[in-house]
A protein has these predicted regions:
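Amphipathic, Lys/Arg-enriched alpha-helical patches that create a basic surface
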Residues: 132-142
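Short, highly charged C-terminal tails/helix-capping segments
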Residues: 144-154
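The feature represents the first ordered module of a protein
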Residues: 49-83
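Intrinsically disordered or highly flexible coil/loop and linker segments, enriched in small
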Residues: 32, 141-145
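Charge-rich, low-complexity N-terminal segments
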Residues: 1-56, 104
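A short, solvent-exposed beta-edge/loop patch
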Residues: 102-134
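Ordered, soluble secondary-structure elements with a strong preference for glycine-centered loop motifs
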Residues: 9, 13, 79-80, 119-126
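Short, internal acidic amphipathic alpha-helical interface segments
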Residues: 69-110
Length: 154
């Protein structure tokens, strides 16, 4: 087994090309995929999907020296029933594959995950984007109903 030194830089060009090509094909073929954009300064892609339970889901794919990170903004910080919301989401974490619910700096909820570069291929990109979409569609409404019950009249 070859160990890579922490300061040894990995050539990211092949991964960038793979992600670019996959996203271009998906944008052409997948009617749920509305937009793809890229920030080349930080090797980050923005993927916007049309949803049913939530109007839009935006996924950020960030290519780093060791991992591909992916995340989506799930919902704002709950206004009420904080414990119930966080318990609901933590219990869902047990069922998720390759992702987890996380609380951001501003207390908003995110779905986040990462994979080693060695795992990045078209099948995994499809799994990441598809799973993110499915998890948002499945868990968004119940979490929102708990955290914003008064506002939603629930």
């Amino acid at each position: 087994m070859r160990l890579t030194a922490i300061d040894e830089l990995v050539d990211l060009a092949p991964y960038e090309g793979l992600i670019e090509r996959w996203l271009e094909r998906e944008l052409a073929d997948n009617p749920l995929l509305l937009a793809v954009d890229r920030d080349p300064d930080v090797r980050r892609w923005y993927v916007r999907l049309r949803g049913e339970q939530r109007d839009f889901t935006t996924i950020w794919l960030t290519l780093g020296q060791r991992t591909l990170r992916y995340e989506t903004y799930f919902m704002p910080a709950p206004e009420e029933q904080h414990e119930a919301v966080y318990e609901y989401l933590l219990r869902r974490n047990h069922r998720l594959f390759g992702m987890r619910f996380s609380i951001g700096d501003e207390d908003a909820v995110y779905l986040v995950g990462q994979m080693p570069l060695s795992a990045v291929d078209e099948v995994e990109l499809d799994r990441v984007v598809g799973s993110t979409y499915a998890y948002v569609e499945q868990y968004f409404r119940p979490a929102l109903a708990l955290g914003f019950a008064s506002r939603l009249g629930a």
